[in-house]
Amino acid sequence: MSRYTGPSWKQSRRLGLSLTGTGKELARRNYVPGQHGPNNRSKLSEYGLQLAEKQKLRFSYGMGEKQFRNLFVQATKIKEGTLGFNFMLLLERRLDNVVYRLGLATTRRQARQFVNHGHILVDGKRVDIPSFRVEIGQVISVREKSMKVPAILEAVEATLGRPAFVSFDAEKLEGSLTRLPERDEINPEINEALVVEFYNKML
């Protein structure tokens, strides 16, 4: 399954989750798109609930199904901690997500574009792979030639607050992951246990 590239507001309403992080998509119409949207909330089966939760998490990070599933498999190999939370930590450590958390982009989709276009450095070296796994303490910065890109400057200006697990220097346009996040600091609207149940049946 390829990565969804259509309007994020449609996907947000379908999932009942703001994919942009602003909540604007759901402010006026918090039901699925379509002619029968307001009356189209049928009761889901156990499998349907698991699938819906998996889709919410996958679309939140803007990933294709194959890449998402492969990352879950990697999480199953981590000995310590719970599988669901370990999976979410791997998602959080993706470079595109860290760029988003630092406030260098307004959405994860935009962050992925910045990485793909070569605007982002890791410890001074350009990395154009959104799935690159960021280590604690690595310095994420904007390439010197990209420091005046309007979209990046606008994103930094628009960011009102950042998670406690990152640090950021607005003058240098650089920051880092200072520690791994706690469970209550990321995606509180997601029930990762349902995602684990879904993949346990599939794998």
From Swiss-Prot:
An annotated GO cellular component: small ribosomal subunit
Span of domain S4 RNA-binding: 93-156
One GO molecular-function entry: structural constituent of ribosome
Keywords assigned: Ribonucleoprotein, Ribosomal protein, RNA-binding, rRNA-binding
Keyword Lyase: no
GO BP, sorted A to Z: ribosomal small subunit biogenesis; translation
Alphabetical list of InterPro entries matching this protein: Ribosomal_uS4, Ribosomal_uS4_bac-type, Ribosomal_uS4_CS, Ribosomal_uS4_N, S4_RNA-bd, S4_RNA-bd_sf
Highest taxon above the source species: Bacteria
Pfam families for this protein: Ribosomal_S4, S4
Record-stated family: Belongs to the universal ribosomal protein uS4 family.
Quaternary context: Part of the 30S ribosomal subunit. Contacts protein S5. The interaction surface between S4 and S5 is involved in control of translational fidelity.
Biological role stated in the UniProt entry: One of the primary rRNA binding proteins, it binds directly to 16S rRNA where it nucleates assembly of the body of the 30S subunit.
Official protein name in the record: Small ribosomal subunit protein uS4
Lineage, highest ranks first: Bacteria, Bacillati, Bacillota, Bacilli, Lactobacillales
Gene designation: rpsD
